[in-house]
């Protein structure tokens, strides 16, 4: 068919900009200030209180704007969007994007066809905590708006032995272990890759420090994924609430 012929012609060579979090209160700076981060959605009979009052709900809904540069970068879905189907996560007409996923189920490639306005597999899921490569085949950056609920409660993200691509389950920028709770129970290496190139950060479990310039470890952005290399499996756990 015409569609299949077109897709066969899509050749891909083998191989962050800062996210902008917005809410009802305007732009939010680098560190997540949870009381101002969320465009709060109140569930059930909760009403909106006066501007001076502080009100919290069980579910907090927000959106994250991310610029995906031309070429390859490692991206993540920062919010729960229903079933986290790729067609919902990236929204309508995201541009000439191809998503490369590497996980327990193996390797998969999923492309968006701008002519037919559909993904190869629009039902494929990309949940918070997972990282994946994105190839933007266009000449300019593509702006994606992620919409959904902020993950809360007891969060757990499996880190297997060997290589995996992961991200923070919470839409927060910060030092990987100090701010985001990444486990440093053993020697671990983190690989980051974006428009500006790549960086490698290694944690020395004997000296209990990273090899970064300040010794405090890599900084990870909102909706940024990264490679992790571990000698043994563990879980990246975190107890999080937007009311903190």
What are these model-derived regions, one by one?
Residues 2-6:
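Extreme N-terminal basic, low-complexity initiation segments
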Residues 50-244:
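N-terminal exported-region signature
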Residues 10-11, 20-23, 42, 88, ...:
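Detector for intrinsically disordered, low-structure N-terminal pre-sequences
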Residues 40-47:
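Bacterial N-terminal signal peptides
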Residues 34-40:
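Sec-dependent signal peptide recognition
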Residues 8-9, 13-16, 20-22, 26-27, ...:
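Short, positively charged and aromatic/hydrophobic N-terminal segments
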